[in-house]
Each structure stands twice: as structure tokens, then as C-alpha cells.
Amino acid sequence: MVKKPISSSDEVFKFEIPSSPKSSAGASHSSTDSPSSVFLSSEAENGVEDRKRFSKSPTAQSPTSSVEAESPDQKRSLGLWSKSSFDGSNLLSDKNDCKTESKADSKTERKKSSSSSQYKANMHFHKLFLDVPTEEPLRQSFTCALQKEILYQGKLFVSENWICFHSKVFGKDTKISIPAFSVTLIKKTKTALLVPNALIIATVTDRYIFVSLLSRDSTYKLLKSICGHLENTSVGNSPNPSSAENSFRADRPSSLRLDFNDEFSDLDGVVQQRRQDLEGYSSSGSQTPESENSRDFHVTESQTVLNVTKGETKPPRTDAHGSRAPDGKAKILPAHGQSETIGILHKMESRKCPTLRHILIFYAIIVCALIISTFYMRYRINTLEERLGSLTSIMDPHSTEQTAPSSLGSQVQLNVEVLCQELTANIVTLEKIQNNLQKLLENGD
């Protein structure tokens, strides 16, 4: 009768405190040595084994009672720990929720502010430039300055089909509207030969330089993305032809000549003219950014002229190579073009060397002329000194002869003056005597 409630109490303790190590140990011990397990096994075993297990059961009851005595304290500690952990998890979850809400609010505010600023910029853009249709939105605006006789600080507006600039300096509005399809050149350049913050935008008739760009690379990429025809032209001028073009050229007959000296003579003239212009630029002292930019622009123009002329003379070359290689391989063409460019460069260098030689010869002639002139001037100076010496020796006796009468004349002049002074003094004394005699005569009468 006593053994059954013990087993029930063991089962209750085992379910109430599953996490404590002591209880788990006691539970395992009690589960193996409990009287209920003894009764279940005794039904299948003999009486000797039952007696042995009954002798073990009183010893197994002592740890279970101690564990039951310790269970209320453990329950309290576990309850407090679970409450504190639950409160901490609630606080952490609240903080995380607050952070996520603040981030979401800041993102929404930023989106609203950016959308409002973009809307205002779009309205301002369409208000300034009436040529741009209202259906075309503004893509981006950049702060920059237009370089002319002075810098016009303003903004560069870029839309899908227009590149516009607006500036207001000294109450004067400056507006520039450039259609994207009319742009022929977009190039990076430097301000004052040092600062890389400028762009050149050129059309067929005009050329504009925009400086003080804070983000030049992003501006350049955006303008290139808008002016897609420039990329198409650059791809069209590439030296690698397509496979279909190569096959077509390979099938054509090779009855054309291979001598192009007459055709490249015009190119030599153009190159020579450009070289003279570049030498003129280099001979000038200080260069302004405008002169550098204009030089770059002229160089690009000459390059386009060379590309056009090469494009005109390209089919005969490709036909000739097509006749030699009927398989249609175009790997020889770039090498041929490179050899031509190398030949042109060698010609230019060979032309530059004689010019340097002529300059050195000219300087040597000038130095020789200066040396000869110095010797001649020295000879003339010596002859003049000799003549002056002879003239001074001739003039010395005449000067001695003239000094003697002049000294006598000066002495005579001194004697005359002394005599005049004495005579005047005597006359004065005589007048005094005469006056005294007249007074005496008057008194005597």
C-alpha cells in the first residue's frame, strides 16, 4: 500500500521540474529503483528477485524526499528568472521596433524631400526653358560655370533630349539650349592646366566650356548616355569590321591597285599644316585654358578629317587583302593601318629633324657674324683713338702761342683799370679843393 503513492509522487516530481539537474538525476534514479517498477517486473520474475528489489527500495526513497524538499526554492528561482528574461526580451523587442520605425520614418521623409526637390527643379527647368516640352522630365541638374570672357556661374540642366544652361550674373540672364542630337563632341578637360573639373560640349556651330563641376565623371557619363549617336559614330570608326563585311569584301574581285601615295599626299599636307600650328602654339609663352581647349578641339577636328579620308580609301585596301586571303580573315587590316601610322610618324620625325638642323645652322651663322662685327668695331675704335692722339699733339703748340698774348692783354687791362681809379680819385680831390677856394673867396669879399 505504501509503495504505490511513492511511485506516483516520483512521477509528479519528474513532470514538474524537468530542467533541474538534481531532479533529473533523482528522477532517473527513482525511475530505475521505484517500487512501481519493482511490481511491474516482479510479475514476470521469481520471488528472490522481488526480495532483493524490496531491500533496495527504502534506500531509494531518501533522495526523492530531499529533492521534494528542495523543489519550492527551485520553482521560485525559475519563476523569477523566467519573468526577468521575459521582461528583458520585451524591452529588446520594443527597442528594435522603435529603431525600425525611426528608420522607416527617416526613409519616407527623405523620399518625400527628394521627390519635392525634384518636382521643384523640374518646374523651374520648364519655366526657364520654354523650348523644352513639358512632357519631358528633368533627369538631373549640376552646379557649374560657363567659361567666356568671365565665368558665368549657374546650373546645367540635363533632360532626355536637351542640355541647357542658365546663369544670372550682374542681373544678366544667360540661357543656352543645346539639342542632344546636335552635339558633335563631349570631352573632359582641365581648368588652369591642373584642375580636372571641366567639360567641352561642341556642336557644328558653337563650342562651350563648362568648368567648376563638382562631379565631372557622373556628368560626363550622363551626357554620354544621352548623346548615343556619338557612341555609334565611334563604333562606326573602329578599325575592326564585321564578319559579314569581311565576307562581302572577300568575295569582291581584286582588280584594284595597291599604290596609295597620291591619296596619302593630301594627308601629308594636312599633317604638316597641323604640325606647324602646334609649333606655333608651343612657341607662345603662357597658355590660357581657352587656348588649350581650342587646340584640343582643332586636334579632334583634324583626327575626324583623317578618319574620313581613311574611310574613303579603306575599300580598295580591304579588297586587295580579300583577294589575297579568300577565307575572309581581317586580322591583316589593323596591322596595315598601324604600319601606315608608323610611317606617317617617321615622316613627321624626319621633317622635324631638318628643321632643328636649320635652326642650329642659323644660330651658328648669327654667332659668327656677331664675332666678326665685334672685331671690326674694335679695329675702328683703335684707329679713332690714334687719330685723336695725333690731333691733340698738333693742337698743343698753337695753344701755347695763344696763351702768351692773352696773358699780356690781361695785364694791360689791369693797369688801365688802376690808372682810371687813380684819375677819378684825383679828380675828386681837385673838385674838393676848388670848392674850398670858392668858399674862401666868398668870405674875403
UniProtKB/Swiss-Prot annotation:
Q: Where is the GRAM domain?
A: 123-190
By its UniProt entry, which CDD domains does this protein fall under?
Answer: PH-GRAM_GRAMDC (cd13220)
Bias-annotated ranges (Polar residues): 1-10, 56-68, 82-93, 281-291
Q: Where is the composition biased (Low complexity)?
A: 18-37
Q: Which residues carry this modification: Phosphoserine?
A: 238, 255, 265
Q: Where is the composition biased (Basic and acidic residues)?
A: 94-112, 311-330
Keyword Phosphoprotein annotated = yes
Q: Which GO terms describe its molecular function?
A: identical protein binding
Q: Which InterPro entries match?
A: GRAM, GRAM_domain_protein_2B, PH-like_dom_sf
Name by which UniProt lists this protein: GRAM domain-containing protein 2B
Tell me the organism. Answer: Rattus norvegicus
- Gene that this polypeptide is encoded by: Gramd2b
